[in-house]
């Protein structure tokens, strides 16, 4: 009995959409947590002003890595997406006159790293477990 390595296929449209939405929602959660921790409260305008630079950074990361091909992978595209989100986001904050303190950059790196890489790690673990169960199930039927 020979065991073959599963062929890597580009992601399905549903997976791409869910991954993009997950990334955007997690960046928004980062923004809302940050604003509330500074007693800025929720205002749509203020939240959008804080959110847009990171959203643009996220989009740049997706485009630069062609993340739609394998959006759930951690190393590529996950790590570059995370770094583009932070670096481009901070650069755009500077250009738009928003504050960029060193402590904020550190917090953004940590929190967005946990958020943008964390869900990918979890999804990858779940997918591996599902693949193993499916392989075991098909092997037992054969």
Regions found by a protein language model. Give the residues of each.
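Short, Lys/Arg-rich, polar N-terminal cytosolic tail immediately upstream
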Residues: 1-13
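Membrane-helix boundary elements
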Residues: 11-47
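Membrane-water interface at the C-terminal end of transmembrane alpha helices
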Residues: 14, 113-135
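Alpha-helical membrane-inserting segments
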Residues: 26-37, 60-68, 88-92, 96, ...
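Structural signature of hydrophobic alpha-helical transmembrane segments
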Residues: 44-56
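Small-residue-rich segments of transmembrane alpha-helices in multi-pass membrane proteins
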Residues: 53, 80-92, 111
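Internal alpha-helical transmembrane segments of multi-pass membrane proteins
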Residues: 66-84, 102-109
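Membrane-helix boundary connector in multi-pass membrane proteins
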Residues: 91-107
């Amino acid at each position: 009995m020979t065991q073959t390595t599963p062929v890597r296929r580009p992601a399905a449209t549903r997976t791409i959409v869910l991954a993009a939405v997950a990334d955007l929602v997690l960046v928004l959660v980062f923004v809302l947590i940050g604003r509330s921790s500074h007693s800025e409260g929720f205002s749509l305008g203020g939240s959008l002003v804080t959110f847009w630079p990171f959203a643009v950074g996220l989009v740049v990361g997706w485009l630069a890595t062609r993340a739609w091909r394998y959006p759930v992978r951690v190393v590529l595209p996950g790590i570059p997406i995370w770094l583009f989100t932070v670096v481009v986001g901070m650069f755009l904050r500077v250009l738009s006159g928003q504050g960029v303190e060193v402590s904020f950059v550190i917090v953004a790196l940590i929190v967005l790293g946990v958020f943008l890489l964390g869900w990918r790690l979890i999804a990858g673990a779940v997918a591996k477990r599902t693949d193993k169960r499916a392989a075991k199930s098909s092997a037992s039927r054969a």
